[in-house]
């Protein structure tokens, strides 16, 4: 069975992606999310897990920090990583850019570091923002 890691899987787009994967694949889905203000999402994921709790595992962690060995072992190996975890509400970055740089730049670097440890990884997908134009 294929395994996929989704950062930001409790967010608005992320949880819809989890639902899509549950419906159209037999993959094991692992969600890594900070569950901060933007993701009222544990409620979203709880509702999904009722649908198929055996295939969805949720880990709460801050991916802007290096993924420690214990968490890396618990997460395991993945065939795919979809990185959509980010600081949202981009208009707030005008007055306070630091959290956005940390989450959106440093967080992506940390996920790429984690991806290098994956011996089975075939694809790393990065979601950007609807504010890029």
Residues covered by each model-derived region:
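N-terminal Rossmann-like NAD(P)+-binding domain of SDR-like oxidoreductases, especially those catalyzing
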Residues: 1-133
